[in-house]
Curated annotation (Swiss-Prot):
Organism: Bacillus pumilus (strain SAFR-032)
Binding site for ATP: 10-11, 18, 89-91, 99, 124-130
GO cellular component terms listed in the entry, alphabetical order: cytoplasm
A molecular-function term among this protein's GO annotations: ATP binding
Subunit structure, interactors included: Homohexamer.
Taxonomic lineage from the root: Bacteria, Bacillati, Bacillota, Bacilli, Bacillales
Cofactor(s) annotated in UniProt: Mg(2+)
CDD domains, per the entry: PPAT (cd02163)
Gene symbol of the encoding locus: coaD
Protein name (Swiss-Prot/TrEMBL): Phosphopantetheine adenylyltransferase
Pathway: Cofactor biosynthesis; coenzyme A biosynthesis; CoA from (R)-pantothenate: step 4/5
Keyword set includes Thylakoid: no
Family statement: Belongs to the bacterial CoaD family.
Enzyme class: transferase
């Protein structure tokens, strides 16, 4: 069994901040499963399938990245993949407070799984999918915030 991590998120859409964490995780872990979750409290712009495909395109040069969707408990997905680590990115203290709740619950559900927090690079500390969608919705440029494929997909969604 290798050194496997799961990097979960809604990724609606994937940003360069997300990719920073995914790519840095790929240097540390033998395999990283990017797990696209459908967050019932959010109304997604892209379908789960579209989000998976956009991440696949953005990570196509990284052979140890696998992109899948999952509906259910994250710890169940991690166990299914034989992952012992959940990889999460942190931007600010508010992210930590939110993540701490999820981490604590995951420990209750499966004590064998650890959470690995990685600080986002400063250049992405303000970046979120919500901000990207808001800027794109009003015809603002998201160049330098998302991969080219996502930039094109956003234009298509809002102008299509």
């Amino acid at each position: 069994m290798g050194n496997i991590a799961v990097c979960p998120g809604s990724f609606d859409p994937v940003t360069l901040g997300h990719l920073d964490i995914i790519k840095r995780g790929a240097k540390i872990f033998d395999e990283v499963y990017v797990c696209v979750l459908n967050n019932s409290s959010k109304k997604p712009l892209f379908t789960v399938e579209e989000r998976c495909e956009l991440i696949r395109q953005a990570t196509k040069d990284l052979p140890n990245i696998k992109v899948e969707s999952f509906h259910g408990l994250l710890v169940d997905y991690a166990k299914q993949k034989e992952a012992k680590v959940i990889l999460r990115g942190l931007r600010a203290v508010t992210d930590f407070e939110y993540e701490m709740q999820g981490t604590s619950m995951n420990k209750v559900l499966n004590d064998d799984i650890e959470t690995f927090f990685m600080m986002t690079n400063n250049q992405y500390s303000f970046l979120s999918s919500s901000i990207v969608k808001e800027v794109a919705k009003y015809d603002g440029s998201v160049k330098g915030l998302v991969p080219k494929e996502v930039e094109e997909a956003l234009i298509e969604k809002f102008k299509g």
